[in-house]
């Protein structure tokens, strides 16, 4: 399979965007161990691993914590989990998500929950660079875990919802993440397949974001427009052409940036009849993928928190079990 990937490195200026070629993300985002501590979680021994991520081209340093739990039996692979928004929570924060963690560990999977530190998580100091570059370091974190922490790297499953799902999806479309994971379980979207449609597009389509969701301000922020135009938050106004161009570059299905849609990685999507219309955006990405994929839909549920509701969590567990 021929990979068609161009890494777009957004400059930190308000409007700037430079194409800097195609370096490996692992050479750009340098991951370093800061500390490790032992805890108990879910009545199991666990570790909190703090990592520093230095993105040299962006001149920023960010931090994550990884909550890692290993099964008591021989491992059958690894499950790497990421969360929505700016990724500032662990995956296991409630009854259903903790039940899913326990389920995976009981099956023999090591679990690694990524929690971005700072009030804006992966968005810390990234205003103005666009979504792909802002979440690019996800791949470097996963590769670090693969090289330094995972016992069994033959079956790596990446799983995330909403903003957690697009951390994975941008890795696949832009940064060759397929070389590092076997399966991806994407829930609650990903909601950024076509940002122009989501924000300024056809209101009649399920891929149009409804008013009042947090994605408008997040999108303004990550492009440098929060309190400097507020173009997405004020979408009733006609946006300047440069806004539409930047949103296209930031979309998973960009028309101006070459993206990879044919993967060695097996992709599984799980969505509800989402009140935020993340399912409509997710379906756009799903339909464009040219390799192995599955679509699972829960029409009677409207929650965006797919992993936190019983029907969504049960489907996630069902899928995980089939991947072993």
Set out the residue ranges of the language-model regions:
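Bacterial signal peptide processing site
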Residues: 18-20
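Conserved alpha/beta-hydrolase
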Residues: 101-122
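Alpha/beta-hydrolase active-site loop
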Residues: 127-150
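C-terminal motif of bacterial Sec signal peptides marking the signal peptidase cleavage site
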Residues: 14-16
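Short, surface-exposed "cap/lid" segments of acyl-processing enzymes
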Residues: 69-103
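Serine-hydrolase catalytic core
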Residues: 222-315
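Primarily recognizes the serine-hydrolase "nucleophile elbow" in alpha/beta-hydrolase
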Residues: 153-209
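N-terminal cap/lid segment of alpha/beta-hydrolase-fold proteins
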Residues: 27-74
